């Protein structure tokens, strides 16, 4: 397991079977000390992905279904990729990417990418919500649905923002701002947003193809007919079972296979997730 070469700047969790999270669309009245309702989930892992929980000094191997929150960090090694679900949005990292969750609450999902490539696919945005990606040179803010890509130059000197669909705003030093619209790809060479290039969207690479295949999985999931897209993990239901109508309960999901002697809380592990405490993380 490889540790990042340079430094990189927590929602009551209910996990049952596939670690589904129900996210309310409207904010629930909370006291100032209550944790946020929104949490991220590691929904796909491939290769060697390192994880540093908030407040820890050590890096460990990332686990599927792990809940993520403010202060958590990820690093993808060579030939590795990772996917995270945050409500009706999905974040994906390509190989050799350094990622940090700066702030995750009911309205804001502020992240940081200091190395590598990231795709942000937003299916829906509730009023007052935003998604932000900070890089070494700028901040990219999304407040509407769309498909976005962020590339950091190998030396960290520039950031390229690509908007496949939607619109996003870039912010830099001295209150500088720039709107990147659908069909545009802009490379920013400085933090003041004075030195930039407007480019045609590059030909899609292997990472883009993978992102498209994952997006299609979500968009064509049968479970979308029965479960809100805001339920984290809804697409996984298609992989492990199907839906039937019952006179008493209506639409009911049934697992396709149940091992003999199955019981809850056997296939997985308990993890301490601050500030919510011990949380069951399923292996499915």
Question: What are the functions of these language-model segments?
Answer:
Residues 25-32, 230:
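A short, compositionally biased domain-edge/stem linker segment
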Residues 13-23:
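Bacterial N-terminal signal peptides
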Residues 2-14:
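Bacterial N-terminal signal peptides that target proteins for export
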Residues 126-128, 173-177, 181-284:
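Low-complexity segments
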Residues 29-169, 174-185, 220:
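Flexible, surface-exposed loop/linker segments and immediately adjacent secondary-structure boundaries
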């Amino acid at each position: 397991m490889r540790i990042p070469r340079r430094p990189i700047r927590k929602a009551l969790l209910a996990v049952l079977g596939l670690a589904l999270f129900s996210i309310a669309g409207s904010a629930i009245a909370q006291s100032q000390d209550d944790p946020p309702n929104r949490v991220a989930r590691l929904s796909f892992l491939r290769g060697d992905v390192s994880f540093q929980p908030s407040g820890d000094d050590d890096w460990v191997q990332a686990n599927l279904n792990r809940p993520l929150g403010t202060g958590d960090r990820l690093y993808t090694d060579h030939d590795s990729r990772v996917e995270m679900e945050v409500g009706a949005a999905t974040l994906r990292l390509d190989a050799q990417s350094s990622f940090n969750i700066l702030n995750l609450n009911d309205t804001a999902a502020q992240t940081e990418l200091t190395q590598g490539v990231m795709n942000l696919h937003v299916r829906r945005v509730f009023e007052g919500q935003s998604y932000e990606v900070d890089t070494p040179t700028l901040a990219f803010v999304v407040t509407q649905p769309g498909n976005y890509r962020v590339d950091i130059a190998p030396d960290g000197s520039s950031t390229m923002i690509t908007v496949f669909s939607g619109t996003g705003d870039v912010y830099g030093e001295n209150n500088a701002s720039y709107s990147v619209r659908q069909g545009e790809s802009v490379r920013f060479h400085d933090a003041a947003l004075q030195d930039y290039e407007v480019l045609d969207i590059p030909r899609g690479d292997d990472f883009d193809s993978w992102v498209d295949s994952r997006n299609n999985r979500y968009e064509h999931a049968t479970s979308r007919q029965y479960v809100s897209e805001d339920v984290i993990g809804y697409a996984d239901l298609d992989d492990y079972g199907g839906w039937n109508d019952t006179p008493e309960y209506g639409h009911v999901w049934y697992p396709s296979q149940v091992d003999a002697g199955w019981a809850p809380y056997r296939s997985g592990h308990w993890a301490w997730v601050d500030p919510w405490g011990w949380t069951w993380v399923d292996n499915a």
